[in-house]
């Protein structure tokens, strides 16, 4: 039975997949994201950046799987970033950075890009590789200073792309989106369904594999 392997430590991605009927095997890649981005150069498009990161994660995990899993599985690597003002915003990493980022994006709109890399493995070999990104436009509110500081102090925005969540406390400060909500959380179900179809798998086969 085909197993889905999620090459990500993201709680949001895991939640999306579980709510959609798939309980993946989670394997964290440990990829040096800064090194991958640096190798691309300053002119790389948002799609190229998130796809390169997703691919690096999927490749790293695929090469480390136990034989029993690698015999029949799909490895899914994802990476998300917010594109606004001609630049990419990743995970703030600190409270000060999160505050600066929110003061930049508050009251504005940006594109949340998520790169997806799907690897089909049979008998330990990669038989198919599909790489694509999805973008959802996010319209941000302008939180009052007290709310913004409380949000940042709680720690939620520090380790998520763009410094916000759609399905957590950050949802209070998103006025709306244009596009796929699951993409904002970190894995686009419509795109993942398309990629699975390209490698000959249906989503219902994964429902039975959890």
Curated annotation (Swiss-Prot):
Q: Catalyses which reaction? A: a ribonucleoside 5'-triphosphate + H2O = a ribonucleoside 5'-phosphate + diphosphate + H(+); a 2'-deoxyribonucleoside 5'-triphosphate + H2O = a 2'-deoxyribonucleoside 5'-phosphate + diphosphate + H(+)
Q: State the source organism's domain of life.
A: Bacteria
Q: Which EC number(s) are documented for this chain? A: 3.6.1.9
A GO molecular function annotation here is: nucleoside triphosphate diphosphatase activity
The family database entries (CDD domains) matched by this protein are listed as: Maf
* Catalytic residue list: 79 (proton acceptor)
Q: Does the keyword Cytoplasm apply?
A: yes
Any one annotated GO CC term: cytoplasm
Which InterPro entries does the UniProt entry name for this protein?
ITPase-like_fam, Maf-like
Q: Where in the cell is it found?
A: Cytoplasm
Q: Which family does it belong to?
A: Belongs to the Maf family.
Protein name in the entry = Nucleoside triphosphate pyrophosphatase
């Amino acid at each position: 039975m085909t197993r889905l392997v999620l090459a990500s430590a993201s709680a949001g991605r895991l939640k999306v997949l579980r709510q959609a009927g798939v309980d993946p095997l989670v394997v964290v890649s440990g990829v040096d994201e800064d090194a991958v981005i640096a190798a691309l150069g300053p002119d790389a498009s948002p799609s190229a950046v998130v796809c390169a990161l997703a691919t690096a994660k999927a490749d790293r995990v695929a090469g480390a799987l136990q034989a029993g899993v690698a015999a029949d599985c799909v490895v899914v690597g994802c990476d998300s970033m917010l594109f606004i003002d001609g630049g990419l915003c990743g995970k703030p990493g600190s409270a000060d950075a999160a505050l600066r980022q929110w003061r930049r994006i508050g009251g504005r709109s940006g594109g949340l890009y998520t790169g997806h890399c799907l690897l089909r493995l049979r008998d330990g070999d990669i038989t198919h590789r599909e790489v694509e990104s999805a973008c959802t436009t996010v319209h941000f509110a302008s939180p009052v200073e007290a709310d913004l500081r409380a949000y940042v102090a709680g720690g939620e925005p520090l380790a998520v792309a763009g410094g916000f969540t759609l399905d957590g406390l950050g949802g209070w400060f998103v006025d709306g989106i244009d596009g796929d909500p699951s993409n904002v959380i970190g894995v686009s179900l419509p795109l993942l369904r398309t990629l699975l179809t390209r490698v000959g798998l249906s989503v219902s086969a994964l429902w039975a594999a959890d």
